[in-house]
Amino acid sequence: MAEEKQTSLKPLTIYFYHTRLTRESYEEWKEYKFPGHILYGLPLLEKHGIRSVMHKCRYFSSRLRLMLYATKEILFCKEKYQVLYATSFRGIEPVIFLRALGLYRKPIVIWHHTAVVNSSGFAREQISRLFYKGID
């Protein structure tokens, strides 16, 4: 009988991006004080051995400031992760475009809550296609 080689896989680590306070919500969920569906599967990931690096959420009135902050946090995160897992693309649009252009190599997984529709103009449609190319 041939011996099977056992390979030890590194546990998967994701960067969990959410537009609300995730760490606090997750701790409240553990104490049955917060609904789990708002955590978009985070409690189940841990059960399957998937480690999470939590995004440090901050609120901004300006979407541009949110994008700059979130992009900086994601690109300069000191903790190692293999996948960017987001509950929304709001705030991480620059990272998605970097992925579409091949400048950000980690896969991006997003819960997209609305239908993808064709844009009205040619230029908008091309930008939209490029944007969605950045989402795995």
Question: What residue spans do the PLM features occupy?
Answer:
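Short, high-confidence coil segments that cap the C-terminus of an alpha-helix
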Residues: 81-82, 98
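Membrane-proximal helix-turn-helix segments that form the acceptor-binding/catalytic region
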Residues: 75-79, 122-136
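A short, charged, and often flexible helix/loop element on the N-terminal side
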Residues: 52-69, 85-87, 123
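Short beta-alpha junction loops
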Residues: 58-60, 90, 113-119
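Active-site proximal beta-strand in glycosyltransferases
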Residues: 83-85, 102-118
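Short, well-ordered alpha-helical microsegments
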Residues: 91-96
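A short acidic, helix-capping loop that chelates divalent metal ions and anchors anionic groups
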Residues: 24-27, 117-121
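N-terminal subdomain of nucleotide-sugar transferases
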Residues: 1-58, 79-81
